[in-house]
Design a protein with these regions (language model features):
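Periplasmic OmpA-like peptidoglycan-binding domain that tethers envelope proteins to the cell wall
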Residues: 2-24, 31-111, 116-118
Length: 118
């Protein structure tokens, strides 16, 4: 997996936004279409989706986002956002999502659901 040049300016902007907040954890999730891999550098869509997430994490770290806030994971074809029946749908399913996680119980934020006072 390689970071395409047209995605770099957007990732640079995202890194700048993520650097405004230095607390919340960030999950980077790679995804693929459902076309099985035949040959190439990755034995399956699991490895490809994880590599996609990892390359974005490396880019964010290189642009100042703290590594201890970042996690990378791959979903393979398990979380499509469009139909895999068309080329356009498969293209939309090949993506990386960046999710800022909520801190539960942090000062000024609500406690996790189900938490109660003693």
């Amino acid at each position: 997996a390689a970071l395409e040049s047209q995605g770099q300016p957007l990732l640079t902007e995202i890194a700048a936004l993520l650097n405004v907040d230095h607390v919340h954890p960030i999950a980077v999730e790679g995804n693929t279409d459902n076309v099985p891999i035949t040959g190439g550098a990755f034995p399956s869509n699991w490895e490809l989706s994880t590599a996609r997430a990892s390359i974005v994490v490396q880019y964010l770290i290189a642009h100042g986002v703290s590594a201890n806030r970042l996690t990378a994971s791959g979903n393979a074809e398990q979380r499509p956002i469009d139909s895999n029946a068309t080329a356009a749908g498969r293209a939309r399913n090949r993506r990386v999502e960046i999710v800022m996680r909520r801190l539960h119980g942090a000062e000024g934020e609500p406690e996790a659901e189900g938490a109660s006072e003693p």
